[in-house]
From Swiss-Prot:
InterPro entries: Prokineticin_domain (IPR023569). This is U8-theraphotoxin-Hhn1d. Belongs to the AVIT (prokineticin) family. It is found in: Secreted. Disulfide bonds join C23-C35, C29-C44, C34-C67, C54-C75, C69-C81. Pfam families: Prokineticin. Residues 1-21 form the signal peptide.
């Protein structure tokens, strides 16, 4: 019974964390993060660091697979952040 209670508690905490990171637009995210994901499941994610997955910046600030790169990095043709 204790194991079931612990598992349920961990699950509830995980769900609360997921819900708290959801976003509808860039304005919902803190500095250094962007709103990315599918139409129904967007989350605030950190901008890409060196070698990490990225999407090029766009004027609509709509991203599906990842965020743009951190400052002083560029998103390469293979969607990885690298030195500009």
């Amino acid at each position: 019974m204790k194991v079931v209670l612990i598992v349920c508690l961990v699950w509830v905490m995980a769900m609360m964390e997921l819900v708290s990171c959801e976003c509808w637009s860039q304005a919902d995210c803190s500095v250094g993060h962007c709103c990315a994901g599918s139409s129904f499941s967007k989350n605030c994610r950190p901008y890409g660091g060196d070698g990490e997955q990225c999407e090029p910046r766009n004027k609509y600030e709509v991203y599906s697979t990842g965020c743009p790169c951190e400052e002083n990095l560029m998103c390469s043709v293979i969607n990885r952040c690298q030195s500009a």
